[in-house]
Swiss-Prot record:
InterPro entries xref list: Mit_carrier, Mitochondrial_sb/sol_carrier, Mt_carrier_dom_sf
Protein name: Mitochondrial thiamine pyrophosphate carrier
This protein's record includes keyword Membrane: yes
Matches recorded under PANTHER family: SOLUTE CARRIER FAMILY 25
Molecular function GO terms recorded: antiporter activity; thiamine pyrophosphate transmembrane transporter activity
Membrane topology: Multi-pass membrane protein
Length: 320
């Protein structure tokens, strides 16, 4: 299970093994879902309606956007910003899972609460994600800039992007969108961890004995379900974050349609509601749900997989 397990037969992974499992989980998951992330970001940053009826809309559907990106920018466009994204995923995965395991253990040892309760997993999951976000947010800004730029490219390399952004916008550029990110990530990650735990209990209750044997499938399905639930409930804040992160980068967005400037989180929400309607808060939701199902499913699947591998290694070593 994810989180501290007080049972005597629970996993006995070291802190380093937990961090490595989280890192590898993030690395593999990111490589697999990068195309969905690029499409999602393009949708979120488009001010025109995602509809065929709007003649000014560059993108209006997942398949149409995929074809257009492929035709205009080539296959590698689906992995734009992949290097900063991988750095982000590796660091984020390590810090998030390590923090979560330590926090749930702290709750178990220092309070009367059960470390496996829904509310405990929600709070610990949210705090763990906020810790990871503070650690890797500058890389997230770089990833968004790379994924958002079209052709010709504004940034050619990671080093070029860092230097250009620092000189033209100052050091604060690397923490653009931090407030909505933290506001969004706490409930999102909290729901991921708590829903994953709850869905696993529900799965064990609902499935016949034969279906319980395949633990890897169980982890994948429950992780996917947790991803869909958490993403749907917190999606508007993710959209605000992306809009704010490309502030000052409007010249590179000219080829994608309208360009707007936002003074902050509340101004962004107000402008989206006034000019794009309530549905504007959910632009890019369809690729986001697909991405959330895959990414969260893979995240928990690979994390549990590698933790189990380390657990088996530890048990074998102790028996020698």
């Amino acid at each position: 299970m994810v989180g501290y397990d007080p049972k005597p037969d629970g996993r006995n992974n070291t802190k380093l093994q937990v961090a490595v499992a989280g890192s590898v989980s993030g690395l593999v998951t990111r490589a697999l879902i990068s195309p969905f992330d690029v499409i999602k970001i393009r949708f979120q940053l488009q001010h025109e309606r995602l509809s065929r009826r709007d003649p000014n809309a560059k993108y209006h559907g997942i398949f149409q956007a995929s074809r257009q990106i492929l035709q205009e920018e080539g296959l590698t466009a689906f992995w734009k910003g992949h290097i900063p994204a991988q750095i982000l995923s590796i660091g984020y995965g390590a810090v998030q899972f390590l923090s979560f395991e330590m926090l749930t253990e702290l709750v178990h040892r220092g309070s009367v609460y059960d470390a496996r309760e829904f509310s405990v997993h929600f709070v610990c999951g949210g705090l763990a994600a906020c810790t990871a976000t503070l650690t890797v947010h500058p890389v997230d800004v770089l990833r968004t800039r790379f994924a958002a730029q079209g052709e010709p490219k504004v940034y050619n390399t990671l080093r070029h992007a860092v230097g250009t952004m620092y000189r033209s916008e100052g050091p604060q550029v690397f923490y653009k969108g931090l407030a909505p990110t933290l506001i969004a990530i706490f409930p999102y990650a909290g729901l991921q961890f708590s829903c994953y735990s709850s869905l696993k209990h529900l799965y064990k209750w609902a499935m016949p004995a034969e279906g319980k044997k395949n633990e890897n499938l169980q982890n994948l399905l429950c992780g996917s379900g947790a991803g869909v639930i958490s993403k749907t409930l917190t999606y508007p804040l993710d959209l605000f974050k992306k809009r704010l992160q490309v502030g000052g980068f409007e010249h590179a967005r000219a080829a994608f349609g309208q360009v707007r400037r936002y003074k902050g989180l509340m101004d962004c929400a107000k402008q989206v509601l006034q000019k794009e309607g309530a549905l504007g808060f959910f632009k890019g939701l369809s690729p986001s749900l697909l991405k959330a199902a895959l990414s969260t499913g893979f995240m928990f699947f690979w994390y549990e997989f590698f933790c189990n591998v380390f657990h088996c290694m530890n048990r074998t070593a102790s028996q020698r």
